Amino acid sequence: MTPSEFRQSVRRGAFRGPTAGHCGPFAQANLAILPDAYAHDFLRFCQANPKACPLLGVGEPGAFRIDALGDDLDIRTDVPSYNVYRDGRLTERVESLDALWRDDFVVFAIGCSFSFEDMLAREGIGLRHVEEGRNVPMYRTSIANRRAGIFGGQLVVSMRPLRGADAIRAVQITSRFPGVHGAPIHIGDPRELGIEDLNAPEFGDAVTIRDGELPVFWACGVTPQTALMDAKLPIAIAHTPGYMLMTDITNASLAVF
């Protein structure tokens, strides 16, 4: 299935699940959507936190398309699930933004680690959340983001359990793709990130960690949602964690070496 066909299936309601493992050679994107009045500070926030918030594209006020992401793409309908935040609280999850769209909304598309999973799989590195049919586990850490204006919050990380040799190989592979979070930020003891229980992720689903495996943590594009909550904007919208926007950008084009 091409990215365009995948987006069409989401648009007509045929697909509503997590997007990991779909359209493997193509990049997926996290979303943050907020009023134009706050967009400059949010852009500065992304630039100050590039590991967690690598920008793939920024829209014009009111625009629900970003040409660099896909020719027939519609931000309002092409994500399986959206989170709506009001005054810093998650108030609802919706499957379309048609009823909520405003002429002053600015879209930020941020790289997603699902993008490099295809390369890991091609190297024979198993991905437990895909194997178990679950959403990837994501955790809010105790690490503060670099603040920009009203935006702060804490770093969020995704976790994939890997054997030692696979973890080393994963570092080598993902280092080539800083536009989708790049190399892991931590391998091993989750308490060093302020994570007390790997079986209780704040976002996504817990996965099995087998004997001899290490938890490997990548900076995650859910991080902006902690910033949106921290800022307590009257309204802000994001993808539901794990339910991403499929783009026409090839993963190969994002490699820096």
From Swiss-Prot:
Protein family (similarity comment): Belongs to the D-glutamate cyclase family.
Organism: Burkholderia orbicola (strain MC0-3)
Keywords, alphabetical: Lyase
The keyword Nucleotide-binding is assigned to this record: no
Protein's name according to its UniProt entry: Putative hydro-lyase Bcenmc03_3969
Highest taxon listed in the record's lineage: Bacteria
Gene Ontology molecular-function annotations: lyase activity
InterPro entries, alphabetized: D-Glu_cyclase, Putative_hydro-lyase, UPF0317
A Pfam family assignment: D-Glu_cyclase
Enzyme Commission code: 4.2.1.-
PANTHER family xrefs: D-GLUTAMATE CYCLASE, MITOCHONDRIAL (PTHR32022:SF10)
Disulphides: none
